[in-house]
Regions:
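Central hydrophobic cores of alpha-helical transmembrane segments in multi-pass inner-membrane proteins
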Residues: 51-63, 67, 73-74, 149-158, ...
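Hydrophobic alpha-helical transmembrane segments of multi-pass membrane proteins
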Residues: 16-22, 48-53, 90-101, 148-155, ...
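Transmembrane helix-boundary motif of multi-pass solute transporters/channels
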Residues: 10-48, 234-243, 252-254, 258
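Extracellular loop-to-transmembrane helix junctions
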Residues: 35-61, 87, 141-142
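Membrane-interface "cap" regions at the ends of multi-pass membrane proteins
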Residues: 1-30, 58-63, 67-79, 85-89, ...
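Inter-helical loop and helix-membrane interface segments of multi-pass membrane transporters/permeases
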Residues: 2-5, 34-38, 68-90, 103-162, ...
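Membrane-embedded translocation segments of transport machinery
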Residues: 2-8, 12, 170-259
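Hydrophobic alpha-helical membrane-insertion segments
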Residues: 50-56, 90-111, 175-185, 259
């Protein structure tokens, strides 16, 4: 039986929203450093193994639960077992905590973009080096851009699943892909780029020499996997609740982590 509430208007729209949930600042900023600090290619190997044997299964399970119940995280677990709503509340709580710092970073990015554009079209350079110091010293500005970022999110969510989140994701995700390719090309042309690539990708298997260091890498890779794929916070359950019964969950579950 199809859900009576709204649904994704297309599988492409769902994929863009789900990939957008997975590809965030945690990957752009955090993942490269975690790779380099935890054995480079050795960390990547552990991460890929976890995604293949754990991430795919958890994501498929969450999407299945969401589509089957047609409810958000709390309601879905309550539908499975009346004693399990606390699992959904924990997921919502973790998402709320993540929003706490993502909204601040989002406001900072908006302020940086505004400063860059104003100075670029004004013919002046933008002093990126001093930006962060001036940013944290300007509390009213921080609060203002934080509020603006939250307001934009509220407007998008109020548009509904297809008219808001899906429509925005169809534009934002291709734009993000173009920006990432631009950044990759730009970074590759910078002095010291090769040293950075070596730091990230050259495997250092000495991290597996002791049980403690191995579990440190495993813990870091597992945390990155759950964070990167938006697992355990109810996002995929909620997205799955708006999926049509005709969509192929297995294929979607493969596409999202790979993207």
């Amino acid at each position: 039986m199809e859900n009576n509430k709204g649904q994704w208007s297309s599988n492409f729209g769902f994929l863009m929203a789900a990939i957008g949930s997975a590809v965030g600042l945690g990957n752009i900023w955090g993942f490269p450093y975690k790779m380099g600090a935890n054995g480079g290619g050795a960390f990547l190997l552990v991460y890929v193994i976890l995604v293949v044997f754990v991430g795919f299964a958890v994501m498929l399970g969450e999407l299945t639960i969401g589509r089957k119940t047609g409810k958000g995280a709390v309601g879905a677990y309550r539908a499975l077992n009346k004693k399990l709503p606390w699992v959904g509340y924990m997921g919502v709580g973790s998402a709320f905590l993540i929003l706490g710092f993502y909204s601040v970073l989002g406001g900072m990015v908006m302020r940086y973009m505004l400063g860059f554009l104003v100075n670029m079209f004004g013919g002046a350079g933008f002093a990126a080096e001093g930006f962060f110091g001036s940013w944290i010293a300007n509390m009213p500005g921080m609060v203002g851009f934080y509020a603006l970022f939250m307001l934009l999110n509220i407007v998008i969510v109020m548009g509904g699943i297809s008219g808001g989140i899906e429509k925005f994701s169809k534009v934002a995700m291709p734009a993000l892909a173009v920006m990432l390719v631009t950044v990759i090309v730009y970074v590759a042309c910078q002095p010291g780029a090769m040293e950075g690539y070596k730091f990230m990708f050259v495997p250092d298997f000495s991290v597996f020499d002791s049980l403690k260091s191995f579990f440190d890498v495993l813990k870091s890779a597992a945390g990155q996997m759950f964070f990167s794929l938006s697992l355990g916070m109810g996002a995929m359950i909620t997205y799955g609740s708006y999926l049509s019964k005709s969509e192929d969950l297995n294929t979607n579950t493969i596409i999202i982590p790979v993207a």
